[in-house]
Regions:
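Domain-scale recognition of functional cores that engage charged ligands
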Residues: 64-86, 92, 100-423, 427, ...
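C-terminal catalytic/acceptor-binding lobe
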Residues: 395-476
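Generic structural signal of hydrophobic/aromatic residues within well-ordered alpha-helices
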Residues: 19, 23, 40-43, 76, ...
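NAD(P)H-binding Rossmann-fold N-terminus in SDR/SDR-like oxidoreductases
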Residues: 97
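Low-complexity, highly charged intrinsically disordered N-terminal segments
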Residues: 1-70
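Generic low-polarity alpha-helical segments
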Residues: 1-11, 30, 43, 59, ...
Length: 476
């Protein structure tokens, strides 16, 4: 059985059937009838484990396609200037590891060093650090934090992470247009963006962009999607179901997102994607969205937490490489970076699978008992989709693998939640993995420990020639 992606409801119904199928395969029909959530939670690593994980081989840096720093970028520049690249911004994340709310809206200019220490302490507590280690964090001086940030947080231009993300792309495209003797405003009007937000902030953020004249973009070229959240799944007397209402008929407070894989699949639902025209949402049918995708030479999917993006949103070498690989019939290009040696973090990692005789990107929750420090080549979460329609159509036909987890909801009870991942598209289509000659460590804002480097990245962004003036152009 496969996921049915025609609508929100068909996704829900087919996902229940697939989870049941997976549990019966693991436990057997008779044990499944008496199965409890506690038993599922106890075996969750084994349930999610990638098949043959024990035989997977580590991939060496030299075994990955190295991006040529001297690659001809003229086709890449032309594709951007003509509006033939779709810029996708995945900004629905709720920063659960940081515990600070929707990441898009975070404005670090409102922080101070006491707040940063608080973030570091909260993270240490969550990780179960010793009292001695926590006390060391409490004793970190403002002077040390300032050295790491290279400024006071209040010195930053007062912008949310999301606005910084959008503005950097506008800034870089304008610079590219000027270098090529093009009128920047006209080039910006040709650009197409797809912005994915969560239910709690979608209205606020989309209206903010509309109020700021879409940062110079044509409203017809800006698509939005509100990633849906889901009630928790309960197992009772051998039956799985989305547990939506209590005995008094009130909606349960147990909704969570189904990870970025569901976000990708939701694009294929009817009436899920919309434009804002004359202040109103105008929804697209699936066929309208597919038609919208037809002209693109590449879709680039950005993750809002990538910090290198804040001073260089356009990677011409990477785009040029993706376009070349697209001509070689690759439908997905994933960039690989090194692990953070100072604070190894979880994430998708590259391995060679001897069963299917190719490299695969495997998400961390499928890696069974591998530790973070065992993960060497990580997914940068910066993906290209040359031949964009091919990967989208394949996704509709097959759906993504369904991992799941048992988590506590806001109502204090535990439920099953699905956690499909975007990167698993690499199992559906011909995928190329690329990296740099000099393997750089992953550089993002996933954890509290990375907050000072995030302030620094924002400070570096503010120092770019003309960036402050661009923010003023839009009244920010």
């Amino acid at each position: 059985m496969k996921l049915d992606l025609k609508s929100f409801e068909t996704y829900k119904n087919s996902s229940i059937s697939l989870i049941k199928e997976k549990l019966i395969e693991f436990y057997g029909q008779e044990r499944f009838k008496k199965l409890t959530l506690a038993q599922i939670k106890e075996n969750i690593k084994a349930l999610n484990a990638y098949p043959g994980i024990e035989d997977m081989k580590e991939v060496e840096h030299n075994d990955v396609h190295i991006i040529d720093e001297n690659v001809n970028t003229s086709k890449a520049e032309e594709a951007i200037l003509n509006g033939n690249v779709l810029w996708e911004h995945a900004a629905a994340g709720e920063a659960t590891r940081l515990g600070l709310g929707t990441k898009y809206l975070l404005d670090l200019s409102k922080f101070n060093f006491s707040k940063i220490r608080e973030v570091l302490i909260n993270e240490a507590v969550k990780e179960g650090k010793s009292e001695e280690e926590i006390n060391k964090i409490k004793e970190i001086k403002d002077r040390q934090l300032k050295e790491e940030c290279e400024c006071e947080p209040s010195d930053l231009i007062p912008l949310s992470l999301g606005l910084r993300h959008m503005l950097q792309l506008i800034y870089d495209i304008r610079k590219l247009a000027e270098r090529n003797g093009k009128y920047a405003d006209k080039v910006i009007k040709k650009q197409k963006m797809f912005i994915i937000l969560n239910e709690s902030t979608c209205d606020e953020i989309s209206k903010e962009l509309a109020a700021n004249n879409f940062l110079g973009l044509n409203p017809e070229n800006v698509l939005f999607m509100e990633q849906k959240s889901f009630h928790g799944i309960t197992l009772r007397k051998g039956e799985l179901f989305y547990d939506e209402m209590d005995s008094d008929g009130n909606e349960k407070n147990n909704k969570r997102l189904h990870n970025h894989g569901q976000m990708v699949m939701q694009k294929l639902h009817n009436d899920s994607i919309f434009r804002i025209l004359d202040g109103e949402r105008k929804y697209l049918k699936r066929e309208e969205f597919l038609k919208f995708l037809e002209p693109f030479k590449d879709m680039i999917s950005y993750n809002i937490e990538d910090l290198s993006y804040l001073t260089s949103s356009i990677d011409l070498q990477s785009l040029a490489t993706a376009l070349e690989l697209g001509e070689e019939r690759y439908d997905m290009v994933m960039e690989v970076v090194g692990q953070n040696p100072k604070k190894p973090q979880k994430g998708a990692s590259l391995f060679f699978d001897p069963r299917i005789k190719k490299n695969v990107m495997v998400e961390s929750f499928r890696l069974f008992n591998l530790k973070n420090e065992d993960l060497k080549l990580m997914n940068k979460n910066f993906n290209h989709y040359p031949n964009t329609l091919n990967s989208i159509k394949k996704l509709f036909e097959e759906g993504l693998p369904l991992g799941f987890e048992v988590k506590e909801a806001a109502d204090g009870k535990e439920y099953i939640y699905l956690c499909p991942v975007q990167g698993d598209i690499n199992f559906l289509v011909n995928t190329a993995f690329v990296t740099r000659k000099e393997l750089k460590p992953i550089y993002n804002w996933k954890t509290g420990a990375q907050t000072t480097q995030t302030v620094k990245a924002m400070h570096d962004q503010d120092k770019q020639e003309g960036f402050k003036e661009l923010t003023k152009k839009f009244g920010l």
